[in-house]
């Protein structure tokens, strides 16, 4: 995928997600965001060039890579339920949520029938490292998706 064709959607631009979303903008990617709970971060990112979309439908159809950075599995499942009927075939979902033991498997199973790609990628570090762009990550997905 060419950088100009990559339309990244980010859900969860709060405590950890703000710094990650900020770095996506710094690298000149198109960034779509949708309000989850934190308006302050949304407003800052919009001023820096992010596009705030108001509905999950518009968010899903205008993003071919979606990053989900929410607090836990329960919230992640609610987000997926809101998105899944609008996801376009071939969309890549990168889930950096802190899940419970079976959370990522449950999310994967929720998405199986949608012809999208799912990648679990918990990160190591905190908000400061997120803003500096120096988080570590563990990636779990099918090899062809990773490549």
Outline where the language-model segments fall.
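Residues in the short beta-alpha loop(s) of Rossmann-like NAD(P)-binding domains
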Residues: 37-39, 72, 142
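NAD(P)+-binding Rossmann beta1-loop-alpha1 motif at the extreme N-terminus of oxidoreductases
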Residues: 1-68, 127-130
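Rossmann-fold NAD(P) dinucleotide-binding segment
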Residues: 56-118
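Rossmann-fold dinucleotide-binding core
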Residues: 8-10, 99-147
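Generic preference for hydrophobic
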Residues: 52, 93, 137-139
């Amino acid at each position: 995928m060419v950088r100009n064709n990559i339309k990244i959607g980010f859900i969860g631009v709060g405590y950890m997600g703000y710094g990650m979303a900020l770095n996506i903008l710094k690298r000149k990617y198109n960034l779509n965001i949708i309000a989850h709970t934190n308006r302050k971060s949304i407003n800052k990112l919009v001023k820096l060039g992010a596009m705030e979309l108001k509905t999950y439908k518009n968010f899903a159809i205008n993003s071919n890579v979606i990053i989900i950075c929410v607090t836990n599995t329960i919230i992640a499942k609610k987000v997926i339920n809101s998105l899944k009927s609008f996801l376009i075939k071939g969309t890549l979902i990168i889930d950096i949520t802190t899940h419970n033991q079976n959370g990522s498997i449950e999310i994967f199973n929720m998405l199986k029938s949608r012809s999208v790609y799912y990648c679990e990628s918990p990160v190591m570090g905190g908000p400061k490292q997120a803003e500096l762009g120096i988080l570590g990550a563990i990636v779990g997905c099918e090899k062809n998706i990773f490549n």
